[in-house]
Amino acid sequence: MLTTLVVTASLLFTGAPAQSTATKPLTFRGMTLQIPRTWKVGKEDMWGIHVKTGGCDRLAVECRGFYLVGPEGISLARHGNPYDPAEPYHPGNGLAACVPDKRYVADFPGKLVARGLRPVGAGHKATYRVWRVGCATQSARRTGVSYQERIWHLPKSKILIFDQWSNGRLGTILERATWS
C-alpha cells in the first residue's frame, strides 16, 4: 500500500505519463525528436523543415521556432557557399533580415559566444555554436537590437539544427533524440 502510494505520488508530481502523451514524434533524416504537441511542423522544402514553437511577434521576420536543415540547405548556406562553422548560418544570398525586428538587417558575422560539442541522442555529437548577431539599418547604423543564433551541426548525418529564438526546451529535446 505504501509503495503504491509513493509511486503514485511520484508520478503525480513528476508528470512522467502526462509528459509522454503531451509530445509527438518528429522524424528527419533518421533522427526522431519528441516535441510538444503544441508545436507546429511545417512542410519540408529544399531548406528543411520549420518547426513553430510559439507565437508570431508583429515585428519578427517569422514565427518563433527552429529549422531542421538537410544536405541542400547545408550546401547552399551564406552566399551560396556550404555552411561554415566559423560563421553564423544564413540560407541564401544577400542581406538577412533581423530575426526579432524585420525593419533591420542582420549585422553578420556577429560574435561567437559559445562553442563545443553537444549530444544529439545516443552516440551522436553535434558541433555546437552560439552567435550573438546585432541588427543594423540598411545604411549600416547599429540599432541596439540583437538576437542569439544557436546551431547544432551533425556533418555525418547531414543535419543542421538552426534556432534563432533561443528556445529553452530545444537542447534537452535534442539530447533525447533517437536514431534509426
Feature locations, PLM:
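Conserved polar/disulfide-associated segments of primarily extracytoplasmic proteins
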Residues: 45-168
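N-terminal targeting sequences that direct proteins away from the cytosol to non-cytosolic compartments
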Residues: 1-63, 147, 153-180
